[in-house]
Amino acid sequence: MRSFTNLNPCYVLLPFFLVLATNATHTNNFLPRPRTGYYGSACWNVESIVRSVVESNYLANPANAPGILRMHFHDCFVQGCDASVLLAGPNSERTAIPNLSLRGFNVIEEAKTQLEIACPRTVSCADILALAARDFVHLAGGPWWPVPLGRLDGRISLASNVILPGPTDSVAVQKLRFAEKNLNTQDLVVLAAGHTIGTAGCIVFRDRFFNYDNTGSPDPTIAPSFVPLIQAQCPLNGDPATRVVLDTGSGDQFDTSYLNNLKNGRGLLESDQVLWTNLETRPIVERLLGLRFPFLIFGLEFARSMTKMSQIEIKTGLDGEIRRVCSAVN
């Protein structure tokens, strides 16, 4: 069993620039939202309740860490961070092809159930998802950061609205998708490096290792030694749903290993490998790896970018609600 008391203290971050406000209760409508300390005495133990649920589920299945991180990303990039991805039903976001492999819905519902007992009708599912993503990243060895709270849950969830960055996207397309959400190129590289944990299905990348762009050969940017390794795990006639670790050699640890793999031509996804071959994004990767000055500290930059992402198009006022259960509107 993994101990949570031995996490790298350098990754426990308390940057003042992430703290929007403190000691504010959710009854004061004159203060901005989201903000840290939003719930105040109305639900003073919200973070400890979520953390407890996250810890038990991480111990039960560490794969919940990349699962919830990916879910948070998919939620925020479609109509903002409003937990619309959690809504179940015909033609909801959950039914869109990119979301069919999402996992961890039960974790968020478990936290919601406990919070409804402790603080009825107070904490939004969107806030729970943001907190859970932070806590799972931290348990996997990544940074901790203050999460501004006060999001409301959305009432609309449509599969037709799901437009997400794809695994074969060029840097230009990825930049466009991120810019639409007011995220810059550095945010793009840093958040893509979240692939340091998790897996991908063979169907997403197999052609790249066998028949790239219908050439009958692998993508020439892939390291020759990496090709047979992936081909063995994802044979042409194999199950397309087979999962392969994104970060070869360090798939369950949040670190810079995946970025180093990109440098060595061992990126599993084309959309990630192009971050090294592109002249604009490569210097950012180098700075995160400590190969180019001024250096960037991955944990610190990931916390910054996650904080920005978690505030995309949030719902406030009459635009949202506090759901009683996360899978259905009130």
Swiss-Prot record:
Molecular-function annotations in GO: heme binding; lactoperoxidase activity; metal ion binding
Cofactor: heme b; Ca(2+)
EC number assigned by the record: 1.11.1.7
Binding-site list for Ca(2+) 2: 196, 247, 250, 255
Catalytic residues (UniProt): 74
Cofactor binding comment, as recorded: Binds 1 heme b (iron(II)-protoporphyrin IX) group per subunit. Binds 2 calcium ions per subunit.
Cleaved signal peptide residues: 1-24
Domain of life: Eukaryota
Cystine pairs: 43-119, 76-81, 125-326, 202-234
Note: There are 73 peroxidase genes in A.thaliana.
Protein name (Swiss-Prot/TrEMBL): Peroxidase 70
Underlying gene: PER70
